[in-house]
Each structure stands twice: as C-alpha cells, then as structure tokens.
Amino acid sequence: MVKRIKVVVTGANGFVAKNLRKYLSKNNINLISISRNDFKEYNDELKIISKNYDEKIIIDKIKNSDVLIHLVGIGKQSIHIDYEMINVEFTKHIVNLAKKAKIKKIIYNSGLGVSSKTSVGYFISKFKAEKIIMNSGLNYTIFRPSYIVGKDDLFTKFLKKQIKLKIIEIPGSGNYSIQPISINDVVKVFLQSLDQIKFKNKIIDLVGPDYLTFEQYVKLFSKDTKTKIKKINL
C-alpha cells in the first residue's frame, strides 16, 4: 500500500487555503488544517482551532507530518496588527513548530515582487519571512505568486466593491504589467511540490500566461458597468 502524504496547512480559512485543501483532499492527501477561527473540514481532515497557534495544542497532532504549507499572512496592516508581527514573527513561530514536530519540508506562499531591493513594507516583510525559511535547515519551496484570481478572491472582491461605487481608483499610472494566475493552476503546482525533487530548495514565481497592464485588467473587469477609472498619484 502506498503511504499517503500527510500535510499540515496553516491559515485554513483563507482563499488560497480553502481551494488548496479541497484539491488536496480530492487527491488523497492526509490533511491537518489549522486556523484561528472555526471552519468546515473535508472528509478525513483533522481540524485544529487555536487562536495563537499554541504549541501545546498543535505539536502532538502534527508530529512527523511530511510537509507544512504556511499560508498565514496579511497584505494590509493597521495599528493593531502589522507586517512584522504576522508575516515575519509568526513565520518564525511556524518554522519552530515544524522543526519541533520533525516535519522535513515547508512550503511558503510569498509574493511576486519580493526582493532584497524592495522599499515596500509588505515586500520587505515577505523577504524577511523567506530568509527565515531558507535559513531553517528544512527542505523548502517558496512560491511568489502574482494576483491569484478565482471565486471570492480578495482582488476580485475589492474591484466589485469599487464597481458598486461607480469608480475604481488605480494606484499610479496603471501602466505596470501584471500576470494574473488562476487559483486552479496554483493548487496544481502546490500538489506537485509536495514530493517532487525539482521543487527542493527553490523560489518559484507563479504567474499566468498572459501579460496585461493593471489598467487593462481593471477595464476588462469593469466592462459594461459604466464605472469610472481614476488614477491616484503616488
């Protein structure tokens, strides 16, 4: 009998995680999913609810799993919660949990545009998180996705809200290129990365096949809605 791969997923309630868990479950992956808040589990999925990802609650349940997929992160900060707290320090906590649980591989969802030369706070925090993972001694795969699009994705929700207001605000010129990628393609690559050797200790950009400018994407999305496009100087 072939041994089922045992995978731990953090941030189980998020857009990417929900789609990924569904896909992994259909592909006979043994799932352990963790979230701060309650969620509906799939058949044969172990659900863990822990507000602070408490080691005492989690460690025995995830011990000796094959892979941990870390999907917790924020793209917007406030006075109550910031990039350093979630994207950096929390990643450090998750890496420590993985090592204590004797998990050999970690997969991290970073972001397209992350580099050592960035001056943007969000990308800086993601770069720091990547370094924590790369220096952990664990086998790792880091994905840097472009806009991930699909049912109920955050970017689509944002644009729909703006359309209701009859105006979409574009940061800057809008002439910068994007390569949106379907969530259906993303989950397939995540599944492949669980055990294929070509993904070992790699950083991989996840982008769709089509280039278009941000302004073009917004115009296509809002076509036939009589929505005004407004550019915001940065």
Regions found by a protein language model. Give the residues of each.
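Conserved Rossmann-fold NAD(P)-dependent oxidoreductase catalytic core, especially the SDR/UDP-sugar
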Residues: 86-136, 140-146
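Mid/C-terminal beta-alpha module of Rossmann-like enzyme folds, strongest
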Residues: 193-234
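NAD(P)H-binding glycine-rich loop region in Rossmannoid oxidoreductase-like domains
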Residues: 40, 49-101, 112-117
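Flexible, glycine-rich beta-alpha linker
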Residues: 120, 141-160, 176, 212
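N-terminal Rossmann NAD(P)H-binding glycine-rich loop of SDR-like oxidoreductase domains
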Residues: 2-27
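A short C-terminal helix-loop "cap" of Rossmann-like NAD(P)-dependent dehydrogenase/epimerase domains
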Residues: 159-172, 232
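Conserved glycine-rich Rossmann-like NAD(P)H-binding loop of the short-chain dehydrogenase/reductase
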Residues: 29-36
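Substrate-positioning beta->alpha
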Residues: 154-155, 172-194, 202
